[in-house]
């Protein structure tokens, strides 16, 4: 199995041991975060979704068993491997009863560590394949980050109600997908979802689109047209870029919301409508109200329930999932056998700033698939702005040769032991002769 995008948290109050493990695991291609106490580990688990936790049993303040219990309370699905000394195997048995997936005896045998990690991750992935992922893929939303999980929980809470929803987020973050998810999860899901981008139309056209018009109401009105409010009757009306509408349209929209009735352009007939309204904007409407550009009463009518859609910068851990999702789509569409991204290309995607958010990522992946002549997308197929993104030192996903990794780990152990080769070999679980042989390569 590949190790790209697998996040491991190492928990140990021995900083030197943490550093050695980090170098080793990164050399095997894993993403590694460190925690030097149980408290730090819990903070990180709250902030990030990890694929696996590697936790020492003997720690000051909060031991490994207590840390394990708290981690399982926060996320029961996360696999935890416990590290223990020979003298505390009974503690390892207790850890297994508490929910640990397996345990490792210290000093660690690197081959056994690698095999145990592979086994634990394979076990987790087989469970994931049998249970629905927290991606809301039925709504076209992909992600496992805490920010995405929070968004999905908000959607689940808001959807069953009849409350008006105001969705705020930068352009390209997927505000319409959120609106569609709310509608699809609501009691109105069998009725129409009607959408309209308010920024795409001038005032007169927007009025006609929203409320409809009679035949002959204006030049070109050769037949009567029902507006979007009437089309959405019984269902949901989604108005995108609501912050761009004119003062006159704000007045008309406010009346429609308050009275639950509309009037076609050129008609005196009042039409009652039963519509749930969802609006979206990239603007700060509270600031627009303070500046006098948006009506305060309309703002309060719209902002009954507010949902903030995170930018792609706020959910970077979802970028590999999103990139893979788009890659599969465009590879099928272009009938290309694309296997994936090179580690360098994925590094660039993860560290790029994404001012255009998900829409920009989608376009970048489509472009790369179209230009690709090989099997893996590299930096050559990415737009220049992305390909020139600086990668912070030590955060590359490139996999180092095993010989280099072993040498780094041995040097770290020697530094920890003050250059004592015998002690370094003992802590690494190898003979002094083996240590010297590996150093000389």
From Swiss-Prot:
Origin species: Escherichia coli (strain K12)
Null mutant phenotype: Deletion of the gene confers increased susceptibility to five classes of antibiotics and to some environmental stresses targeting the envelope such as acidic pH and osmotic shock. In the absence of stress, the mutants show no default in membrane integrity or in cell morphology as compared to the wild-type cells. In the presence of drugs that target the envelope, the mutants show enhanced membrane disruption and abnormal cell shape. Deletion does not affect the minimum inhibitory concentration (MIC) of E.coli for zinc or copper.
Residues that hold ATP according to the record: 172-173, 329, 359
PROSITE patterns, A to Z: RESPONSE_REGULATORY (PS50110), SIGMA54_INTERACT_1 (PS00675), SIGMA54_INTERACT_2 (PS00676), SIGMA54_INTERACT_3 (PS00688), SIGMA54_INTERACT_4 (PS50045)
Subcellular localization(s) per the UniProt record: Cytoplasm
Pfam families according to UniProt: HTH_8, Response_reg, Sigma54_activat
A single GO BP: positive regulation of DNA-templated transcription
Free-text activity regulation comment from the record: Activity of the ZraS/ZraR two-component system is repressed by the zinc-bound form of ZraP, which probably interacts with the periplasmic region of ZraS.
One Gene Ontology cellular component: cytoplasm
Function: Part of the Zra signaling pathway, an envelope stress response (ESR) system composed of the periplasmic accessory protein ZraP, the histidine kinase ZraS and the transcriptional regulator ZraR. The ZraPSR system contributes to antibiotic resistance and is important for membrane integrity in the presence of membrane-targeting biocides. ZraR is a member of the two-component regulatory system ZraS/ZraR. When activated by ZraS, acts in conjunction with sigma-54 to regulate the expression of zraP in the presence of high Zn(2+) or Pb(2+) concentrations.
GO MF entry, a single one: DNA binding
Name by which UniProt lists this protein: Transcriptional regulatory protein ZraR
Residues bearing the modification 4-aspartylphosphate: 56
């Amino acid at each position: 199995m590949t190790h790209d995008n697998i996040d491991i948290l190492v928990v140990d109050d021995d900083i030197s041991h943490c550093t050695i493990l980090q170098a080793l695991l990164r050399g095997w291609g894993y993403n590694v975060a460190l925690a030097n106490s149980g408290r730090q580990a819990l903070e990180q688990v709250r902030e990030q979704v990890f694929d696996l936790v590697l936790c020492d049993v003997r720690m000051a303040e909060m031991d490994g068993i207590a840390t394990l219990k708290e981690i399982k309370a926060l996320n029961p699905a996360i696999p935890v491997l416990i590290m223990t000394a020979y003298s505390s195997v009974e503690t390892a048995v207790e850890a297994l009863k508490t929910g640990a997936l397996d345990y490792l005896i210290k000093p660690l045998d690197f081959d056994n560590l690698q095999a145990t990690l592979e086994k634990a991750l394979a076990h987790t992935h087989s469970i994931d394949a049998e249970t629905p992922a927290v991606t809301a893929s039925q709504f076209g939303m992909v992600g496992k980050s805490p920010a995405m999980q929070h968004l999905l929980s908000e959607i689940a809470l808001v959807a069953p109600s009849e409350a008006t929803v105001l969705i705020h987020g930068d352009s390209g973050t997927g505000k319409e997908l959120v609106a569609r998810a709310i509608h699809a999860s609501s009691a109105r899901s069998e009725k129409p979802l009607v959408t309209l981008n308010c920024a795409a139309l001038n005032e007169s056209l927007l009025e006609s689109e929203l409320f409809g018009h009679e035949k002959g109401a204006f030049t070109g009105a050769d037949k009567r047209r029902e507006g979007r409010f009437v089309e959405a009757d019984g269902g949901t009306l989604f108005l995108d870029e609501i912050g761009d509408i004119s003062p006159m349209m704000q007045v008309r929209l406010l009346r429609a919301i308050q009275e639950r009735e509309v009037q076609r352009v050129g008609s005196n007939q009042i039409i009652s409508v039963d519509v749930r309204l969802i609006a979206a904007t990239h603007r700060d409407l509270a600031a627009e109200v303070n500046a006098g550009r948006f009506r305060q009463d309309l703002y309060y009518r719209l902002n009954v329930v507010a949902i903030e859609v995170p930018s792609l910068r706020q959910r970077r851990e979802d970028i590999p999932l999103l990139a893979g999702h788009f890659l599969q789509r465009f590879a099928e569409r272009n009938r290309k056998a694309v296997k994936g991204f090179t580690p360098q290309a994925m590094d660039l995607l993860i560290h790029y700033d994404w001012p255009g958010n998900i829409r920009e990522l989608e376009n970048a992946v489509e472009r790369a698939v179209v230009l690709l002549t090989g099997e893996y997308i590299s930096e050559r197929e990415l737009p220049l702005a992305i390909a020139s993104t600086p990668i912070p030192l030590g955060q590359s996903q490139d996999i180092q040769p095993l010989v280099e990794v072993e040498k780094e780990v041995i040097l770290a152990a020697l530094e920890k032991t003050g250059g004592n080769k015998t002690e370094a070999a003992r802590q690494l679980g190898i003979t002094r002769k083996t240590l010297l042989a590996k150093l000389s390569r």
